[in-house]
Each structure stands twice: as structure tokens, then as C-alpha cells.
A protein has these predicted regions:
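Flexible coil/loop and intrinsically disordered segments
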Residues: 1-374
Length: 374
């Protein structure tokens, strides 16, 4: 807070500190202002507060928002002679961060890019620390180094997807990943031991997965995927397996619940004839029906991917009215990825039933476990 009682952002304080280090050197001041704009406006936009914490974690340790100014004052912007060099370093990593944020990874012509797209599909940011470190090391690296970096990305993805599917939160590894990312960056110090260092990082990630226990088919098959981003991430695992090597995947596909979250009464009546009885239902039966609704609606067997425009147009329609609209557009049905002729595929069924959803979930969960851990 300044002498007028106004709160000043840590970012503004940091900028003033950098300019102060330039002294009366107008050329140096102009260079700082130009770099600052490039980093915090052009590259990062509104995501600068996350970046400055994650960047510091790569250099030193993970920090909280309240620590930002003090740590940057004491560790980063503490030397007039090197202020431009450090800003250029920030600029370089802000580009890496921006790529993680936008999903700018190119075509699916390598396992490296595919692993990045999988991480991006989780809609989490905790992996950005490792993403930035990997981007930095992968530039002009030897093929064998790229291979180990790819393995590290895959292991990171397994941790993230396991965490979100099992409902462990979205930032469980926010302090753990920077430690591993720092080791990745430091591996370049000695080319003779670089692979050994990367092997240790990979082993650390695999050990962490063992601690929290890897996903099983039962986890996926029975999970109530109420959070759309979690179910969407699982569907994207399968979608990315179908995209051609020379093609950039569509990142804007949205999750569709075939049995909608707010299903019309007539549609539920048809689905729930197997539950037994006719309305009006008793309180006990109503509770049972509502539980069954959730088990169906938020089941992986009830999920597909489609464009956001089509998603809004089919909305709460029953399956009989949805299916013609599905057939008019590009719809990603996980079952069709497993087998084009499968009798569980959306295009091959006339009714969307409880038994069908459960069978689809079994088939999809088996595929996902193999795909995630291969």
C-alpha cells in the first residue's frame, strides 16, 4: 500500500524495482519497459500472477502470492548489471508458459506432442512447471534426451489424470512438480549425467503415482464424473488416439451427456421402466430414481464429444430427437474409436438404455486404462 492508501500490485512493485536498477540509463530503462510489456502483456495477459510464481519455483522453490515481491526483490531483481539478462530469461519462459496455456504444440507427429496435448486436455495448470522445463531442455536436444522428456511428460499426465478422476483436487502436485521441473532444468549442467538425472525425475514421478495408487477400470467404470472437465479429459485420451500424425487436434470440442443432466420426464419414464412402478413414486422410490439418474448421466458410458454449437442445440432433448442431429455433424463417440462396427456405438443403436450405458462404460474403461498407462 502506498502513501495514499492505495494497494499496489506486486507486479507493479517488481517493475518499479527493475526500473530502479536501471538508474539514470535511459536506454536501459526503455529496454526494461519493452521487455516488461512483451512478457506481461503480450505473452501472458491476465495469467501473469501464476507465471511469476511458477517461474520462481523453477529457479528456487514454490512460493505463495504473498511472497512474490519479497522473493523477486531478494533473488531475481537484486543486481543492476544482470537485470536485462534476467528479464530476457523471464521472457523466454513466458513463451513456454503461453504455449502450455494455449495448447500450441503443433501436429500429433510425435509421442512428445501427444503427451503435451493429453496434459492440456486436463484443463489444469499445475503441470506447467514441468511443461516449461521440458520445452526449455527439448530445444535442439539429442534424440535420446527427447525420449526421456517424453517419458516424463507421460508420467506427469498419469499423475494429473489419476488425481482428477479420483477427486483428489486439481492442484495436489502444485508444490511437487516444481521440484521435479527444477531437476529437469539442472540436468543440462553435465551432459554426461543428464540422462541419469532425467531417469531419477521419471522414477520420482512413478513413485508418486504408486503412493496415490494408479487408476483401475473400476475407478473409471463406476466414477460419477460430475465435473465436465474430468470426463472431457478422459474422452480426449481416446480422441487424440484417432487424430492423424500430420493434423493438429481440435481443442474446442465440448462434453455432451447423451442422457442430459436435466432430462425431460418422458425420457426418464422410458429409461426407468426397469426401476419398477408408475408415478406417483414414493419418497424412497424417488431417491432411488434420482440416484440412478446420476449413475447414468455422469457415467463415462454416457459421454461423447462434439462442437459447442451442436452441444447447445441438442441440449435436453431425448435420444430419439438427438440422434438425427448427431448424425448431421462431427461427433466423437469413444466406442467408435475402439471399433467402427461395435454394436454399442451411438450410430448403431436405436435406444439409449441403462444397460447400454453400463456396457459402454466397461468397454471404454478397459481401453482407457491401456491407453493411459501404455
Amino acid at each position: 500500500m502506498n502513501d495514499r492508501g492505495m494497494t499496489i500490485r506486486p507486479l507493479d512493485l517488481m517493475k518499479n524495482l527493475a526500473l530502479k536498477l536501471a538508474g539514470q540509463n535511459k536506454s536501459k530503462q526503455d529496454q526494461i519497459i519493452e521487455l516488461w510489456k512483451k512478457i506481461f502483456e503480450d505473452n501472458l495477459g491476465s495469467h501473469h500472477s501464476i507465471f511469476i510464481r511458477y517461474f520462481f519455483g523453477l529457479q528456487e522453490r514454490h512460493i505463495q502470492k504473498s511472497e512474490v515481491y519479497k522473493q523477486y526483490r531478494d533473488v531475481v531483481f537484486n543486481d543492476s548489471a544482470n537485470v536485462i539478462i534476467k528479464l530476457k530469461h523471464l521472457d523466454q519462459f513466458s513463451i513456454y508458459f503461453s504455449r502450455c496455456l494455449s495448447g500450441d504444440f503443433g501436429s500429433l507427429d510425435s509421442d512428445f506432442n501427444k503427451a503435451l496435448y493429453r496434459l492440456y486436455s486436463t484443463k489444469t495448470i499445475q503441470w506447467y512447471s514441468i511443461g516449461m522445463a521440458v520445452f526449455h531442455i527439448s530445444e535442439n536436444c539429442r534424440p535420446e534426451i527427447k525420449d526421456w522428456l517424453t517419458r516424463i511428460l507421460k508420467a506427469t499426465y498419469r499423475l494429473v489424470i489419476t488425481q482428477i478422476v479420483r477427486g483428489m483436487g486439481s492442484n495436489r502436485f502444485e508444490t511437487y512438480f516444481p521440484v521435479q521441473a527444477k531437476s529437469i532444468l539442472e540436468s543440462v549442467k553435465d551432459p554426461n549425467t543428464q540422462i541419469d538425472v532425467l531417469k531419477v525425475v521419471l522414477q520420482n514421478l512413478e513413485n508418486k503415482l504408486s503412493e496415490i495408487s494408479a487408476l483401475t477400470t473400476a475407478h473409471i467404470q463406476t466414477a460419477l464424473l460430475r465435473k465436465n472437465e474430468v470426463a472431457r479429459a478422459l474422452c480426449y485420451v481416446m480422441y487424440l488416439d484417432t487424430v492423424g500424425d500430420s493434423v493438429e487436434p481440435k481443442l474446442g470440442l465440448t462434453l455432451e451427456h447423451v442422457i442430459p443432466q436435466t432430462c425431460q420426464y418422458e425420457d426418464w419414464k422410458e429409461l426407468y421402466h426397469e426401476v419398477g412402478g408408475k408415478p406417483p413414486y414414493s419418497d424412497e422410490k424417488t431417491i432411488e430414481i434420482n440416484r440412478s439418474k446420476e449413475e447414468l448421466c455422469y457415467n463415462i458410458g454416457n459421454m461423447i464429444l462434439l462442437s459447442s454449437r451442436l452441444n447447445s442445440s441438442v441440449s435436453n432433448l431425448g435420444f430419439g430427437n438427438k440422434k438425427p442431429k448427431y448424425q448431421e455433424a462431427t461427433v466423437i463417440d469413444p466406442i467408435s474409436i475402439i471399433s467402427q462396427s461395435d454394436d454399442l456405438q451411438l450410430n448403431n443403436v436405436s435406444k439409449w438404455t441403462k444397460a447400454l450405458v453400463q456396457k459402454r462404460a466397461e468397454r471404454i474403461s478397459e481401453y482407457l486404462i491401456q491407453a493411459i498407462y501404455k
